[in-house]
């Protein structure tokens, strides 16, 4: 990622790298089992082709601009390959249905409805302009979402998820139906960092679901509570799902405004789940956890420094007239790295986090 790079260059670079990781991480068949650190030859070929076709647009950017819509046969072939590798990547990650929908819309553009060369125009618009593949969603991903996901990863590496679960246990663990309430509160707290329903479920569910089952909740209810609570991570400020960033970009609204307006819906969502859990626990006579087994304030207080990166991020995002979103995320990442250096949870990850700080410092100089 280059903070000073032109928009289309940044988008192509980002997409090429993302596709490379897709072909490394997702096998051609979902159930295919591969040896650790083993990549099949055709995945390597697809990786190289994917990087090549999108980096081609970076290297020959000026020539492509000069051609405009009058692209030649080589550019059409490269464009078709760019579409096909993207389709294959989507198939591996999302599945067939989205491919069918996309193919239907692309096929519609190829209908001869007055255009002399519909294929040439379609390839040009889809591949070589910011109205197609490298449009607004990729722009938002490469500029904002990537950095906010990186921030969440750094923060999770510091052990903040365990800190949030300890806080939730301390607050509600001893209450009626304590474990389920802990699941709701910890999911809300972790949702502030992850912005992901799946990530939230994996992080908190590994602790809260077994805890709920041990205290008498039916297994299906325990799973449902965690799934419902973790879904709220998508709408829990300050880091919400990707849709929030797209909303800000497409409506030309400051992310800070969306962040503030999301507080009430998120609060109502988690309050509703919390009350449902409370009444369910009352109806089946479930009690809370033993107070002696719960974290004490003296155990939680020394870890309050883990909240500093989150506080810095919220402060800078609210000051949207002073700091850009990207700059706010980068600074928050750097603060998270500093917090990680002080945390025992990071362990061997400290070296990786320090190495990651170098490009982030370079990026911040460009954004600042």
Residue ranges, per PLM feature:
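Conserved, well-structured core domains of diverse proteins
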Residues: 1-66, 76-80
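Hydrophobic transmembrane alpha-helices of multi-pass solute/ion transporters
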Residues: 5, 34-38, 64-150, 167, ...
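Alpha-helical transmembrane segments
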Residues: 8-16, 139-149, 256-272, 324-333
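Helix-loop-helix module between adjacent transmembrane segments
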Residues: 53, 151-157, 186-200, 228-235, ...
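Transmembrane-helix bundle segments that line or gate the permeation/cavity pathway
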Residues: 56-60, 201, 214, 234-247, ...
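Membrane-interfacial loop-to-helix junctions in multi-pass transporters
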Residues: 73-77, 131-144, 170-184, 215-221, ...
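Hydrophobic transmembrane alpha-helices that form the pore/transport pathway of multi-pass ion
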Residues: 165-233, 243-246, 252
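Long, contiguous bundles of hydrophobic transmembrane helices that form the permeation core
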Residues: 260-366
């Amino acid at each position: 990622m280059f903070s000073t790079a032109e928009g289309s260059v940044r988008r192509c670079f980002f997409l090429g790298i993302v596709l490379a990781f897709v072909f490394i991480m997702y096998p051609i068949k979902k159930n295919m089992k591969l040896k650790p650190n083993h990549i099949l030859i055709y995945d390597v070929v697809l990786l190289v082709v994917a990087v090549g076709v999108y980096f081609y647009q970076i290297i020959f950017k000026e020539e492509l601009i000069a051609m405009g819509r009058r692209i030649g046969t080589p550019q059409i072939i490269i464009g078709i390959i760019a579409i096909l590798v993207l389709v294959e990547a989507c198939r591996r990650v999302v599945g067939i249905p989205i491919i069918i929908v996309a193919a239907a819309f692309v096929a519609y553009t190829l209908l001869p409805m007055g255009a002399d060369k519909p294929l040439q125009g379609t390839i040009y618009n889809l591949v070589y302009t910011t109205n197609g593949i490298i449009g607004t969603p990729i722009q938002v991903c490469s500029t904002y979402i990537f950095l906010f996901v990186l921030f969440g990863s750094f923060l999770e590496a510091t052990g903040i998820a365990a800190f949030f679960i300890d806080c939730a246990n301390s607050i509600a663990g001893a209450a009626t139906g304590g474990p389920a309430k802990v699941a709701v509160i910890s999911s809300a707290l972790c949702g502030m960092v992850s912005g992901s329903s799946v990530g939230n479920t994996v992080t908190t569910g590994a602790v809260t679901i077994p805890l709920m089952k041990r205290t008498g909740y039916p297994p299906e209810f325990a799973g449902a509570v965690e799934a419902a609570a973790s879904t709220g991570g998508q709408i829990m400020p300050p880091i919400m799902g990707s849709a929030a960033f797209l909303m800000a970009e497409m409506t030309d609204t400051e992310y800070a405004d969306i962040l503030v307006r999301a507080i009430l819906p998120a609060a109502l969502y988690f309050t509703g789940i919390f009350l449902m859990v409370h009444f369910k626990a009352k109806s089946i006579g479930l009690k809370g956890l033993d107070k002696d087994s719960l974290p004490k304030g003296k155990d939680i207080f020394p870890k309050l420094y883990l909240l500093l990166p989150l506080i810095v991020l919220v402060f800078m995002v609210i000051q949207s007239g002073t700091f850009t979103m990207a700059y706010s995320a980068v600074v928050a990442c750097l603060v998270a790295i500093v917090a990680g250096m002080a945390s025992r949870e990071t362990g061997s990850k400290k070296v990786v986090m320090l190495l990651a700080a170098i490009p982030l410092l370079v990026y911040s100089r460009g954004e600042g």
